[in-house]
Design a protein with these regions (language model features):
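Plant-biased, solvent-exposed loop and capping regions
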Residues: 1-479
């Protein structure tokens, strides 16, 4: 009996051990990863929205907010703020101890706004790193030539920081990159010719810097490129012919706010997948090529502030969200029919486009979703009341320098409206109290009369009217 009893106990013990071996255990993350992450947290001096509140010593760091693990090693770190929430940011520096996260493949520190310091050298000690997105912060100094040692990277983004100096030529060694995003810094000099070696690129965004010189003619090297953003720099010369090689796949072509010269290339009509074409604020001349009629999928077109001339081609768009042809040498005479028939449009800017029509004759397919309308400096007559009183989301209406005649008190000022400029027209009536909700107002040089309501706007917003009075203008005369 004793032998049977001992045998039974032994079998029970073996059964329990077997069960325990089959039951998964919840091992904590590696101590090096925990140490590195806590060092990062200690470098943060302000975390008003408590993004790192779950990061506590002694708890499993694989369960912390923004941390992703594989086999108990941290592989991704994603701490992201929300730009629409003022308190969603982190202040402080990025601890070099993140180099302890040797299994890290992706680091995403985005929209944190107040992280400071130089180029993060810890990146050079992470052999598995493939994705770097440190965006919308205040990192500064130069991007070091040693960035070329990060040859395993597939994405590199320091979008909207404060880096200065040139783009290092060594970046040409990062041949695995599919995304290179350095927009929104203070970079200077020319685009390194060696970037042509990065033939896997799908995104190349260098906008909002101080880059100069001609745009390199090397775009045949990028068969996969979908987004090219070079706007708001100091580029000169003509639009490179090799951009034509991007026609099969390019979706965004943004070259605006530079000093480009020459004509708009006819080959742009081959970009059948193009969503956005921005050539505004350059020094382009000649006529708009008729081949642009082939851009049936275009949703955003900006050719403003150039020296382009008539005739403007009839476009075959299925719907356009944003159009800006302002300040060229066009004489459109009327708002184009392909604009009028567009089933959806948010922003229409046709300032100084030689439009001569009665506004009531413009009957757009929809007005409900208009955000911005700029018809300034044309020869438009009539009244905008019927048009504007049908909009519910209007943010800005500019129509200065026309011959519009209407009673300002009849205008329905929707809650979303922030900018109203109807200066230098034939507007009459009184200034309604509702204008107090606007951010900017200009009704100068019209035929308005009466006492001004309480206002935050300067006198220049009301000058040149028949008989307006009251602060900030002269006091009204007592009857």
């Amino acid at each position: 009996m004793k032998l049977e009893h001992h045998l039974s106990l032994l079998l029970l013990l073996l059964f329990i051990l077997t069960l325990r071996s089959l039951t998964p255990t919840s091992a904590a993350c590696h101590v090096d990863d925990e140490t590195g992450l806590l060092a990062f947290k200690s470098g943060i001096t302000a975390d008003p929205s408590n993004m790192l509140t779950s990061w506590k010593k002694g708890t499993d760091c694989c369960t912390w907010s923004g941390v992703q693990c594989d086999n108990n090693r941290v592989t991704q770190l994603s701490v992201t703020g929300q730009l629409d929430k003022p308190n969603s940011f982190l202040s402080g520096t990025i601890s070099p101890s993140l180099s302890k996260l040797t299994f890290l493949s992706g680091i995403y520190l985005q929209n944190l706004r107040n992280l400071t310091g130089p180029f993060p050298a810890f990146l050079f000690h992470l052999p598995n790193l493939k994705y770097v997105y440190i965006e919308n912060s205040k990192l500064s100094g130069r991007i070091p030539a040693s960035v070329g040692n990060l040859t395993q990277l597939e994405a590199l983004s320091f979008y909207f920081n404060r880096f200065t100096g040139p783009i290092p030529s060594s970046i040409s060694k990062l041949t695995q990159l599919t995304q290179l995003k350095l927009g929104g810094n203070i970079l200077t000099g020319s685009i390194p010719n060696g970037i042509k070696n990065l033939n896997k690129l799908t995104f190349l965004t260098l906008e909002r810097n101080g880059l100069s010189g001609p745009i390199p003619d090397f775009f045949a090297s990028f068969p996969e490129l979908r987004i090219l953003r070079l706007f708001r720099n100091k580029f000169t010369g003509k639009i490179p012919a090799s951009i034509s090689a991007l026609a099969p796949k390019l979706i965004y072509l943004e070259l605006g706010h530079n000093a480009l010269t020459g004509q708009i290339p006819a080959f742009l009509g081959n970009f059948k997948t193009l969503d956005t074409l921005d050539l505004g604020h350059n020094m382009l001349t000649g006529t708009v090529p008729t081949t642009l009629a082939n851009l049936t999928k275009i949703f955003n077109l900006d050719l403003s502030n150039n020296q382009l001339m008539d005739p403007f081609p009839q476009l075959n768009v299925k719907g356009i969200e944003s159009l800006d042809l302002s300040y060229n040498k066009f004489h459109l005479k009327e708002i184009p029919k392909w604009v009028t028939s567009s089933p959806i449009i948010y922003s229409l800017k046709l300032a100084n486009c030689g439009i001569k029509m009665k506004l009531e004759d413009w009957k757009p397919a929809q007005t409900y979703y208009y955000d911005y309308i700029d018809l300034s400096w044309n020869q438009i007559t009539g009244s905008p009341i019927g048009l504007l009183n049908k909009t519910d989301y209007l943010v800005g209406f500019w129509a200065s320098g026309n011959k519009l005649k209407f009673n300002l008190e009849s205008l329905r000022i929707v809650q979303t409206l922030k900018h109203l400029d109807v200066s230098r027209n034939l507007v009459f009536g009184k200034v309604p109290k509702a204008v107090i909700g606007l951010d900017r107002l200009n009704v100068s040089y019209n035929h308005l009369c009466g006492q001004l309501p309480a206002t935050k706007f300067p006198a220049s917003a009301f000058l040149g009217n028949d008989c307006l009075c009251g602060s900030p203008l002269a006091a009204c005369k007592k009857a």
